[in-house]
């Protein structure tokens, strides 16, 4: 007779198998926001997709909720979009489309089980895609590749496969194959079912694509497809067969092989086939490294970690939300959990399902899900919450910024608003904020990957906190954390041509003017270990 524990375990495993969680990585302008919207369209989460860069009378992108995103037509913050398709629950972790916000993307990838690598068919692999691929590789994420914009002039499909294999070291397996390219792109051939999917353009892709499905050997095929395209397709199929590669799911799940899909997100060609295959081949929620070792998602007690904080998602209520990835067990509304960093207990009374800016209170959640929790200043990025035995998940890394500037508040009457705004934007990781160790220099130092991060901080301080600010750039371009902390820095003695500051967690950070300056310090102080990446949320208390 099956025990209650066995029944609960079976239910848990069944729930896990029907969950998929993924983030999309791409270079700017590869079509990430468009693909995101089309996946939501097919998932029934929206009924009409609007192009972000289209005319003003078209709808704004669902995933772009911040005022500055709507004004500029770019994604500058990550968000979560949950929807159902077939009998799966899908958590789409939407990442910023602009390269200046790559650190937000890094944090989001820490919560993902799968990655979708989006490539422009004309451009192939681009710098930002390569950077983000390296993060996926470190985390051994399965990578599914969608070659986009096949309806425009582009490179030969075989050239793109060769580039991925040569430059990323991934085996490739085309799950489907394009029929034509550019203005002669007609659809794709599905290798698993040996069927041809021909698409019709509709409303600039704002509604689901209509398709005609034909068996490869159907004699009526020439009624639908030009002879030269049909014969070229047959040659391509023969060539793929000669290459002999088979789809190896264990290799896919280990991040060694990438399934390749061809299509056009703008016109919806190939999007549904991609979504269907991803659900079949994608990885269900998996175990994560913790202080207790790798915890399987079937571990009975609830655990999760904070990978993102966001202030003022609802301008009317000036709220602050912590994005929590559920890792193990079952989350239930009103449960009391332990906060690993502070040792306190917290009642989670209003957990929310997230869909960009929209939210709804939920009763329960399972591993792979992302929930929103009200954050009255309790949570920091990387925090672990848990029930049962004490544990802590690995911290989320903090990457080296390249631009630095003092942030000034010229209006003393706005001091409180300025302090509050800076503190809250620092907590959510909108930008790294460093502090001078000179007690007479009170102005915070903004540290960013790109100039647009500075603009966003100033824009949000003005629009959300009513504070106008000015920037004073600093002539530094590299930051390194000191291994061993202040004791190691004191032991090293005097350092030339560097600026010593401290980060949010009170740790020493050295700023260098250039690479030569950094190398000189390393040569003069060989025992001083400098790191370009610092972990966050590993038990260290932030300093105000």
From Swiss-Prot:
Record carries keyword Phosphoprotein: no
Locations listed in the record: Cytoplasm
Residues that coordinate or bind GTP: 26-33, 94-98, 148-151
One Pfam short name: GTP_EFTU
Swiss-Prot/TrEMBL keywords: Cytoplasm, GTP-binding, Nucleotide-binding, Protein biosynthesis
GO molecular function terms listed in the Swiss-Prot or TrEMBL record: GTP binding; GTPase activity; translation release factor activity, codon nonspecific; translation release factor activity, codon specific
Superkingdom, natural source: Bacteria
Gene Ontology annotations of biological process type: regulation of translational termination
GO cellular component, one term: cytosol
InterPro entries membership: EF-G-like_DII, EFG_III/V, G_TR_CS, P-loop_NTPase, PrfC, RF3_C, RF3_dom_3_sf, RF3_GTP-bd
Residue ranges of domain tr-type G in the record: 17-286
Keyword Protein biosynthesis part of the UniProt annotation: yes
Function: Increases the formation of ribosomal termination complexes and stimulates activities of RF-1 and RF-2. It binds guanine nucleotides and has strong preference for UGA stop codons. It may interact directly with the ribosome. The stimulation of RF-1 and RF-2 is significantly reduced by GTP and GDP, but not by GMP.
The family this protein is said to belong to: Belongs to the TRAFAC class translation factor GTPase superfamily. Classic translation factor GTPase family. PrfC subfamily.
Identification of the protein by name: Peptide chain release factor 3
UniProt source species: Microcystis aeruginosa (strain NIES-843 / IAM M-2473)
